[in-house]
């Protein structure tokens, strides 16, 4: 990272600016990782759980650092944070809309200026009312979780798995699942088993994997799905 890509790691940096659907500031003075984390937390605190939000960076070193700060802020509010590989803003907007996310944040670096562009569940730039809510949450300060169970899961979006996961979620009676949490053992191929596990974890269930040994099929019992 060159001198011109310097980042100040301090909570005493000057406050960032909210302009339309964008939160921006100088990367070496205002938009610190701590500030980006607070924006992510304020953005995620508006969602009804369970929920997930996507985060993407334009690819510059500064934007990648801020991306991980935003992911941590989202997860701190119990919302699952999904990292998306570097992509254009229009491609990210499409990803948010098609993967069942409650919203998304695109981290862009324009010279010295770093900006976070906020999207709703339809991949549309956040409305003025929603941005006022995010700004109020940002100014309110930290809302720290008290239990590990209150933290969201940080994962990666890869397209096909997320589409399958969204289809499973659409066919689940969420209220019943949330009110009847238990532990299940899953016997399934690696890829589908991973998706099913994530769905159950999002709903607060405990998951045990039953793996095949010596080339045999996974072992099933009365708790296996």
Predicted regions and their residues:
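N-terminal small/polar loop signature for handling phosphorylated ligands or for N-terminal nucleophile
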Residues: 52-114, 198-225
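Generic alpha-helical propensity signal that fires on short helical segments
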Residues: 36, 41, 71-73, 97-99, ...
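Short, flexible active-site loop motifs that bind/organize anionic cofactors or intermediates
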Residues: 26, 82, 121
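Active-site flanking residues adjacent to catalytic metal/cofactor-binding acidic residues
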Residues: 21, 107, 185-189
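An N-terminal, well-structured beta->alpha segment
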Residues: 2-70, 74-77, 150-184
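Gly/Ser/Thr-enriched, mixed-charge loops and adjacent short helices
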Residues: 5-12, 114-225
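Short, glycine-/Ser/Thr-/acidic-enriched flexible segments
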Residues: 23-24, 60, 110-111, 123, ...
């Amino acid at each position: 990272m060159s001198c011109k890509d310097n980042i100040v790691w301090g909570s005493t940096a000057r406050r960032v600016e909210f302009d339309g659907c964008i939160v921006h500031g100088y990367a070496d003075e205002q938009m610190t990782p701590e500030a980006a984390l607070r924006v992510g937390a304020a953005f995620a605190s508006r969602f009804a759980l369970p929920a997930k939000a996507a985060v993407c960076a334009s690819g510059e070193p500064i934007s990648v650092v801020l991306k991980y700060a935003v992911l941590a802020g989202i997860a701190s509010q119990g919302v699952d944070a999904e990292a998306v590989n570097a992509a254009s803003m229009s491609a990210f907007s499409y990803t948010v809309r098609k993967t069942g996310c409650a919203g998304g944040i695109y981290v862009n670096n324009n010279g010295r200026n770093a900006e976070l562009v906020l999207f709703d569940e339809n991949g549309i730039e956040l409305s003025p009312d929603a941005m006022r809510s995010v700004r109020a949450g940002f100014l309110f300060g930290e809302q720290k979780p008290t239990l590990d169970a209150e933290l969201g899961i940080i994962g990666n979006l890869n397209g096909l798995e997320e589409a399958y996961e969204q289809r499973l979620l659409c066919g689940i009676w969420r209220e019943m699942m949330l009110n009847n949490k238990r532990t299940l053992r899953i016997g399934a191929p690696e890829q589908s088993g991973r998706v099913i596990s994530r769905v159950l974890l999002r709903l607060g269930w405990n998951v045990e994997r039953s793996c095949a040994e010596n080339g045999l099929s996974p072992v099933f019992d009365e708790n296996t799905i």
